[in-house]
């Protein structure tokens, strides 16, 4: 997918997230999840921070731990969002949203994916991921 198209899709997601933050209603959540689903179906991608797996010669998504102790992968809708991270994100890759969702559902050690964890944030637990992407199982 051309980068410009992916950027446009992610801008739609950011706009929906901002609307949800301003009006956190079930209807606005449903709208935001629909926007994410449409972007996913159109081949949308997010920027995923990764870190090396010690001794394995592989990388894995980086994890952020929330105050309740839950562990989450995180992804960004743009490089601008990535730059808001308090940590230096050294390695990233573009991941198809649907493949990222499938991987998250198959990883028992994480609670879900946080999109833009430091600004314009959307926390997608596994239940919400299943709503966006029906047919995926743990």
Placement of each model-derived feature along the sequence:
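An interfacial alpha-helical scaffold signature
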Residues: 1-138
């Amino acid at each position: 997918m051309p980068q410009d198209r992916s950027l446009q899709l992610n801008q739609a997601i950011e706009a929906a997230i901002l609307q949800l933050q301003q009006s956190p209603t079930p209807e606005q959540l449903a709208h935001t999840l629909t926007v994410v689903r449409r972007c996913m179906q159109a081949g949308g991608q997010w920027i995923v921070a990764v870190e090396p797996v010690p001794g394995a010669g592989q990388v894995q998504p980086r994890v952020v731990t929330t105050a309740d102790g839950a562990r989450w992968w995180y992804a960004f809708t743009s490089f601008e969002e990535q730059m808001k991270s308090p940590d230096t994100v050294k390695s990233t890759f573009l991941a198809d949203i649907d493949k990222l969702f499938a991987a998250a559902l198959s990883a028992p050690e994480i609670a879900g994916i946080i999109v833009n964890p430091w600004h314009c944030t959307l926390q997608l637990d596994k239940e919400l991921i299943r709503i966006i992407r029906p047919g995926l199982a743990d």
